[in-house]
UniProtKB/Swiss-Prot annotation:
<dbReference type="InterPro" id="IPR000719">
    <property type="entry name" value="Prot_kinase_dom"/>
</dbReference>
<dbReference type="GO" id="GO:0004672">
    <property type="term" value="F:protein kinase activity"/>
</dbReference>
<feature type="domain" description="Protein kinase">
    <location>
        <begin position="62"/>
        <end position="356"/>
    </location>
</feature>
<feature type="binding site">
    <location>
        <begin position="68"/>
        <end position="76"/>
    </location>
    <ligand>
        <name>ATP</name>
    </ligand>
</feature>
<keyword id="KW-0067">ATP-binding</keyword>
<comment type="subunit">
    <text>Interacts with RPP13L4/ZAR1.</text>
</comment>
<dbReference type="InterPro" id="IPR045274">
    <property type="entry name" value="WAK-like"/>
</dbReference>
<dbReference type="GO" id="GO:0005524">
    <property type="term" value="F:ATP binding"/>
</dbReference>
<dbReference type="Pfam" id="PF00069">
    <property type="entry name" value="Pkinase"/>
</dbReference>
<protein>
    <recommendedName>
        <fullName>Non-functional pseudokinase ZRK15</fullName>
    </recommendedName>
</protein>
<feature type="binding site">
    <location>
        <position position="94"/>
    </location>
    <ligand>
        <name>ATP</name>
    </ligand>
</feature>
<dbReference type="GO" id="GO:0007166">
    <property type="term" value="P:cell surface receptor signaling pathway"/>
</dbReference>
<keyword id="KW-0547">Nucleotide-binding</keyword>
<dbReference type="InterPro" id="IPR011009">
    <property type="entry name" value="Kinase-like_dom_sf"/>
</dbReference>
<comment type="similarity">
    <text>Belongs to the protein kinase superfamily. Ser/Thr protein kinase family. ZRK subfamily.</text>
</comment>
Length: 356
């Protein structure tokens, strides 16, 4: 009778999965209506068995990203679609770090809803579908090759870091301007930026914590229980008052720019005191030259830096300071993206495609 017990167990598991999928489908529909006015693009719903087959049961050999600092961020796996009638053969599969619950289900469904409407933009991952049946919900993206998580220790080229900054600024600007109700990304993390192995394009993912700003308003105020994120990237108005606006993203991006130029270790050496935002600015002024600020790994890769490129790095720092509010009015992300695009264009034309 052992075979009968196994058959009964499989039937129970299948029934539980179907119930979970049905319940979560309702939550997803509510989030699509709430966040996207019901206009999300159609996506494929994968079964749990299809996901297990695509990832070889989430094998370690298929994992793209590891845990960061022992904090359980989302796990990414490469996978193959074995359906010969489906166009997307290579897949990137994101296994959500938490089990789906009444408390966090809205975040997961928001990730799906917003991912679906930004999929056509080159600086976002293209969403193929999702799996609502699994205990840990899953998102499925199209992948040309195996993408990698952004690791500043591996990205040592100045031009590549400049390109990443321009592409993420463009992604944030798109969220702020492309929809009737602007989206604020809110919680920027290096772990949510993936690099396409085929062309090195930086892509922003994970919209779990996005906030939409009502039409005619410039901010929303969150309750204390909703305030969260990486402390480095949180401006005081958000951290203390729960105010979320486009400036929330500008601040986080300004910190991201500084980490791109300095590297994580040097950033924390210069910017350890968040009680005084001028700490970095003052320390930078005491530095004798740009060499004392820029990531040493990147400088080693560059070799001799031209005076023109040093000036461009200085301008990059100044732009980051504007984003975090140290130099007058905080710029819109559209302006930041345009400025970075100019930096990138000037760097390419003046230095060619080799030295940096």
């Amino acid at each position: 009778m052992e075979w009968w017990k196994k058959k009964s167990l499989r039937a129970i598991i299948k029934r539980e999965r179907l119930v979970r999928g049905h319940e979560r489908g309702g939550t997803l529909l509510e989030e699509i209506i709430k966040s996207c006015n019901g206009k999300a693009n159609p996506i494929k719903i994968f079964s749990a068995d299809q996901i297990l087959e695509a990832t070889d049961t989430f094998s370690e050999s298929n994992r793209v990203s590891e845990l960061f600092d022992e904090i359980p961020y989302d796990w990414y796996y490469s996978g193959k679609n074995n359906n010969h009638h489906h166009h997307h053969k290579l897949l990137l599969i994101k296994k959500w770090r938490y089990r789906f619950s009444e408390h966090n289900g809205g975040n997961f469904c928001r990730d799906i809803a917003i991912s679906s409407i930004v999929s056509g933009h080159k600086n976002f991952m293209q969403l193929v579908g999702c799996c609502l049946e699994s205990e840990h919900p899953v998102l499925v993206y199209r992948a040309s090759k195996k993408p990698t998580s952004l690791d500043l220790k591996m990205v040592v080229s100045w031009r590549q870091r400049l390109k990443i900054a321009e592409e993420i600024a463009t992604a944030l600007a798109y969220l702020h301007t492309a929809f009737p109700r602007p989206f604020v990304y809110r919680i920027l993390r290096l772990e949510d930026i993936l690099l396409d192995d085929e062309d090195g394009v930086a892509k922003l993912c994970n919209f779990s914590y996005c906030v939409s700003i009502p039409q005619g308003e410039t901010f929303v105020k969150l309750g204390n229980g909703c305030i969260g994120g990486d402390y480095d990237y949180m401006d005081d108005n958000y951290l203390i008052n729960g105010i979320v606006s486009e400036k929330t993203d500008a601040f986080g991006f300004g910190i991201f720019m500084q980490k791109l130029l300095m590297g994580e270790e040097r950033f924390h050496e210069l910017c350890y005191d968040r009680s005084d935002l001028t700490t970095f600015e003052n320390r930078r002024k005491f530095a004798k030259c740009i060499d004392e600020i820029v990531d040493s790994n990147m400088l080693e890769k560059i070799g001799d830096v031209t005076e023109e490129e040093r000036c461009r790095m200085e301008a990059f720092i100044v732009l980051s300071e504007r984003c975090i509010g140290l130099r007058g009015e905080v710029p819109k992300m559209v302006e930041v993206a345009k400025e970075l695009k100019r930096f990138l264009r000037d760097s390419s034309s003046s230095c060619g495609e080799t030295s940096l």
